[in-house]
């Protein structure tokens, strides 16, 4: 596992479009969330210990913020051929195991990950109602083995600010986790 930080996409960036299949094969796009007050996009996978570590907290965050008109979408861009634990079939199992109530999408070509300049799992992006990036960073300070409870404190603070019509803090700590498992020859040029 290569420990990789987020590239910290510039704040104010417009949400790149996507049209990807969910675990039932339904195509989900950015436009499907047009009426939401905020959109959280999480690049994630099934096997990374950093994602596994926060999955309960991520599932709880979805339960807590869905009633507040917040949408969450998970996107798996890992190479499923070389990492079969991240295959679409295993993603469907992960949705059930983790209790995710949000769409979990498969980015087979890895083009969407590149549009977002995603680097790691988890890599978290929060967009306001105008779909401008207002937060990109860690879920919270908890990491596997550091003894800090998983709370989602950093992302929750950013969500609460957006929902209250306030600015998010400019001090944002990069997310860190396993690198996205790029297909051979498809590695991005932004590293």
Residue ranges and their predicted role:
Residues 1-172, 179-191:
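Chalcogenol-based redox active-site neighborhoods
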């Amino acid at each position: 596992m290569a420990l990789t930080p987020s590239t910290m996409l510039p704040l104010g960036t417009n949400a790149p479009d996507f049209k990807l299949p969910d675990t039932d094969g339904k195509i989900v796009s950015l436009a499907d969330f047009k009426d939401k007050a905020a959109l959280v996009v999480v690049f994630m996978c099934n096997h990374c210990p950093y994602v596994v570590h926060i999955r309960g907290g991520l599932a709880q965050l979805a339960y807590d913020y869905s009633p507040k008109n917040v949408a969450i979408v998970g996107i798996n861009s890992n190479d499923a051929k070389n990492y079969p634990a991240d295959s679409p079939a295993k993603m469907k199992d992960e949705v059930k195991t983790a209790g995710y109530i949000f769409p979990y999408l498969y980015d087979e070509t890895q083009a969407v990950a590149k549009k977002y300049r995603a680097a790691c799992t988890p890599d978290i992006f929060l967009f306001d109602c105008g779909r401008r990036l207002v937060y990109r960073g860690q879920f919270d300070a908890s990491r596997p083995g550091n003894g800090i409870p998983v709370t989602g404190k950093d992302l929750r603070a950013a969500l609460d600010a957006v929902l209250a019509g306030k600015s998010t803090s400019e001090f944002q700590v990069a997310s860190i986790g396993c690198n996205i498992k790029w297909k051979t020859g498809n590695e991005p040029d932004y590293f």
